[in-house]
Design a protein with these regions (language model features):
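Conserved MFS/SLC helix-loop-helix module at the cytosolic interface between two early adjacent transmembrane helices
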Residues: 3-43
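Helix-to-loop junctions at the C-terminal end of transmembrane segments
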Residues: 3-17, 201-214, 300-301
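Structural signature of the two symmetry-related core transmembrane helices
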Residues: 19-33, 216-232
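Intracellular juxtamembrane helix-capping segments at the cytosolic ends
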Residues: 50, 57-72, 79-80, 169, ...
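Helix-loop-helix hairpin linking two adjacent transmembrane segments in secondary transporters
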Residues: 74-75, 82-133
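A membrane-interface helix-boundary motif in multi-pass transporters
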Residues: 100-116, 298-327, 342, 346-347
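Extracytoplasmic gate region of multi-pass secondary transporters
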Residues: 148-209, 215-217, 257-258, 262, ...
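A late C-terminal transmembrane helix in Major Facilitator Superfamily
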Residues: 268-312, 321
């Protein structure tokens, strides 16, 4: 989905938000419906659930997540946080609902129900996604020339590296929960709790960027949450209490990242340039989203005998996630202090 950000940006510029979101909604439902008839064929699932659904999701997500930037000037971060928060809240609900559907029906009917739900919700919703009347599309033009600017390159590298650990926790939380003796059903509920923390982080991060600390300071704090929770808390999470602390702080940090990057671009590159830069930046995140979790999984598989799982088997993956977050943080800190060296300033 994220790899289509540039194409989605072009589609929005040519077709508008409504038609782009409508096209995405149709493709998402179609991909799930067709996948329901091919549950035993990996190649067909790759095409239907991977490609068709992925293209539709890319079009929908881009339309939904960038439209608020056209409407809001003062509270952009909060607007983005509410939109992205809806996504993580949906993930919390659907993780439990999908698990129940698979248990009580089967995979095929789960795909079909999800497809009909996507059509029933996303198609009507697409008609409400519009840009302000009289607003021009000139600032939607992709600003490829930014690659000549050192500050933009630092933003690209810093945020791209920071993407590597973002989806490691939701992949490992069910596995880690089962290693602590919980059932599969409880593990899914624990994953939903992480998604709820992510929802809070997305909304709270946007509010913090707009009102309290500023976008850059908020992004620094967000990456600290991700890095320290992975390096310090997760490796010691041998009890439910410590694991809960990890779920809360890591979920808040991972969620806030998504709502903080757009206002951070506005603070560093100019608010009027955000929509011309954001599709390019999001496309560069593909490597982190695609390779981050498989690398962590490979590290975990090399950690020891997985038949007798304990906290120590997960520590290398946790250290990897935390280290990648802190490396990304160093780039953001450099950008922050090139803006101003004063510590107690909202930026």
């Amino acid at each position: 989905m994220i790899s289509l950000s540039v194409l989605s940006g072009i589609a929005v510029r040519k077709l508008g938000y409504k038609k782009t979101a409508l096209s995405g909604a149709v493709l998402m439902g179609l991909g799930e419906f067709l996948a329901s008839w091919t549950t035993k064929h990996v190649g067909a699932l790759f095409v239907f659930h991977g490609v068709i659904f992925g293209i539709g999701g890319g079009l929908c997500i881009f339309s939904c997540s960038t439209a608020p930037l056209r409407w809001f000037k003062k509270y952009r971060g909060l607007a983005m946080g509410i939109v992205f928060g809806g996504g993580s809240l949906g993930a919390a609900v659907m993780s439990i609902a999908t698990n129940l559907l698979v248990r009580n029906l089967d995979v095929a009917w789960t795909f079909r129900i999800l497809g009909f739900m996507l059509w029933g919700v996303c198609i009507p919703a697409s008609y409400f996604i519009q840009q302000p009347k009289g607003s021009a599309s000139a600032n939607l033009k992709l600003q490829w020339y930014r690659f000549k600017e050192p500050r933009f390159l630092l933003i690209v590298v810093g945020t791209a590296i920071s993407c590597f650990p973002l989806f490691i926790p939701p992949y490992f939380i069910p596995i880690f929960s089962r290693s602590m003796g919980y059932s599969n059903q409880i593990a899914i509920v624990i994953l939903a709790a992480w998604n709820l923390a992510s929802t809070v982080g997305r909304v709270l991060g946007g509010y913090t960027a707009d009102v309290l600390l500023g976008p850059l300071n908020s992004l620094v704090l967000c990456l600290l949450f991700i890095g320290l929770s992975s390096l310090v808390v997760w490796p010691l999470a041998s009890t439910v209490g410590i694991f809960s602390v990890f779920l809360i702080f890591n979920g808040i940090g991972c969620g806030a990242f998504f709502s903080l990057v757009p206002p951070m671009i506005g603070a560093t590159m100019g608010a009027e340039n955000t929509l011309g830069i954001l599709p390019i930046l999001w496309t560069t995140w593909f490597c982190g989203f695609f390779f981050g979790t498989p690398i962590a999984s490979g590290i975990y598989s090399l950690a020891g005998d997985t038949r007798d799982q304990g906290v120590e088997e997960f520590r290398p993956a946790a250290y990897y996630a935390g280290a990648m977050s802190l490396v990304g943080l160093f780039f953001i800190l450099y950008i922050r202090f090139t803006q101003t060296k004063r510590l107690l300033v909202r930026i």
